[in-house]
Amino acid sequence: MNRGGSSASASANYLLCTNCRKVLRKDKRIRVSQPLTRGPSAFIPEKEVVQANTADERTNFLVEEYSTSGRLDNITQVMSLHTQYLESFLRSQFYMLRMDGPLPLPDRHYIAIMAAARHQCSYLINMHVDEFLKTGGIAEWLNGLEYVPQRLRNLNEINKLLAHRPWLITKEHIQKLVKTGENNWSLPELVHAVVLLAHYHALASFVFGSGINPERDPGIANGFRLISVSSFCVCDLANDNSIENTSLAGSNFGIVDSLGELEALMERMKRLQEDREDDETTREEMTTRFEKEKKESLFVVPGETLHAFPHSDFEDDVIVTADVSRYIEDPSFGYEDFARRGEEHLPTFRAQDYTWENHGFSLVNRLYSDIGHLLDEKFRMVYNLTYNTMATHEDVDTTTLRRALFNYVHCMFGIRYDDYDYGEVNQLLERSLKVYIKTVTCYPERTTKRMYDSYWRQFTHSEKVHVNLLLMEARMQAELLYALRAITRHLT
């Protein structure tokens, strides 16, 4: 791969509106570029992130201590809106990429590339192409999967399943990897690889959900670069639709309506907390509510435009560049609803039967020393992180809201908590937020700024980044639970 030009070419992914789709059908050679939007995010005004970074010396210390690139990249800048979480994130990522472990350093970065490619995340691919070469990786491997050792290629199946349908992973997939003669994986190596795959699938969700901009590359003339899918359609470029302009357009939904939505949400949260004290819901009723929510998630269409975004004419077509496709096999394989229409007996992962705390943590720690502690700290940090605020309101208990976000992600992956009332999900998560969650979690490359702007319009960008952190960690934990359960079954 040409390192100097890879960012430009690999970012050439567009979510197309109807008119642009028609144009591209006539001339597929179209190539459009625009100046980068300023700042680390195409969704968040630069000044909000810069102010946070300037005010917090802790961020700079963490970058010096744990950054593999040695600089304050755009992901870190956006995450620095939540410095407590950032420390847990950087420590765990640094450990899996740079500290002692079963896998060679270059292999770790190549696995990160393979994971990011499942979601066409050119930002992460470009980052780890550089890291792969810096750690002594063989440049020829960057020509595509056919140039890498068969042992690495054998990860394709589990990479594909983890990224899109982790519930399909079985002990047979594990056995195939650990019993393949000279190309076999040891269990510690496989656990390391699984942790990396899950981490970078989930991180791709954060990149797209937060509108992370490509890193500025002084080698690109005039500051031009092909824009990534997460921000705009190509027709926005001709109309000079910047982040400021699209933010103004989003305000047309109505400030009064959004204020009413906020008050209504807070009232529902308060009522749920009061009702829980007198709750006598049976276990059977909770199971019924889970099945209902699981089936209803079928009708939450990712990237949905007709119902949730009436002023948008986006369609689902995405152009995948060769720079991305060289790192994946079976590119058409994607997320499929766990609860498919027409199925009566839907297999469910009961969280109580295989929990992270009681099963996954001990297994991963036994086979890949200490990573379990770091991941556990990160999961707990994001789940419990709160400033007791909602938009302009203070002293608010957001526990029910955070739990609903986390459990809704797991519900879409078929994971049920027996002690959770899934009726709370419908009461707390509005339809536009459900569309956003499903898109970011299951089809992150389809995320647009309009989706980001459409939900919780009175909330701060910091609060929306917090949502993205919850979605990212919920997704990573779901992938790990399925993979580690399969490894456990292989061992027993």
UniProtKB/Swiss-Prot annotation:
Q: What happens when the gene is disrupted?
A: Liver-specific Sesn3 knockout mice display insulin resistance and glucose intolerance. Sesn2 and Sesn3 double knockout mice display insulin resistance and glucose intolerance. Triple knockout mice lacking Sesn1, Sesn2 and Sesn3 do not display an embryonic lethal phenotype since they are born at an expected Mendelian ratio. Moreover, they are not distinguishable from their wild-type littermate. However, their survival at 10 days is dramatically affected.
Q: Which UniProt keyword terms apply here?
A: Cytoplasm, Oxidoreductase
Q: Which InterPro entries match?
A: AhpD-like, Sestrin
A single GO cellular-component term on record: cytoplasm
- What catalytic reaction does the record list? a hydroperoxide + L-cysteinyl-[protein] = S-hydroxy-L-cysteinyl-[protein] + an alcohol
Ranges for region C-terminal domain: 310-492
- Identify which residues the record assigns to the active site: 121
* Residues noted as binding L-leucine in the record, renumbered to the chain: 386-389, 398, 463
Q: In which tissues is it expressed?
A: Detected in liver and skeletal muscles.
Q: Where does this chain mainly localize?
A: cytoplasm
Here the disulfide bonds are none
UniProt subcellular location? Cytoplasm
Give one GO molecular function term.
oxidoreductase activity
This enzyme's EC code(s): 1.11.1.-
Q: What class of enzyme is it?
A: oxidoreductase
Source organism's superkingdom? Eukaryota
GO process annotations (BP): cellular response to amino acid starvation; cellular response to amino acid stimulus; cellular response to glucose starvation; glucose homeostasis; negative regulation of TORC1 signaling; regulation of insulin receptor signaling pathway; regulation of phosphatidylinositol 3-kinase/protein kinase B signal transduction; regulation of response to reactive oxygen species
Tell me the segments the record calls region N-terminal domain.
62-243
The family database entries (SUPFAM superfamilies) matched by this protein are listed as:
AhpD-like
Copy the domain comment. The N-terminal domain may have an alkylhydroperoxide reductase activity. The C-terminal domain mediates interaction with GATOR2 through which it regulates TORC1 signaling.
The subunit field of the Swiss-Prot or TrEMBL record says: Interacts with the GATOR2 complex which is composed of MIOS, SEC13, SEH1L, WDR24 and WDR59; the interaction is not regulated by leucine. Interacts with RRAGA, RRAGB, RRAGC and RRAGD; may function as a guanine nucleotide dissociation inhibitor for RRAGs and regulate them. Interacts with the TORC2 complex; through RICTOR.
By sequence similarity, the record places it as follows: Belongs to the sestrin family.
Please describe what this protein does: May function as an intracellular leucine sensor that negatively regulates the TORC1 signaling pathway. May also regulate the insulin-receptor signaling pathway through activation of TORC2. This metabolic regulator may also play a role in protection against oxidative and genotoxic stresses. May prevent the accumulation of reactive oxygen species (ROS) through the alkylhydroperoxide reductase activity born by the N-terminal domain of the protein.
Name-wise, this protein is: Sestrin-3
Record gene name: Sesn3
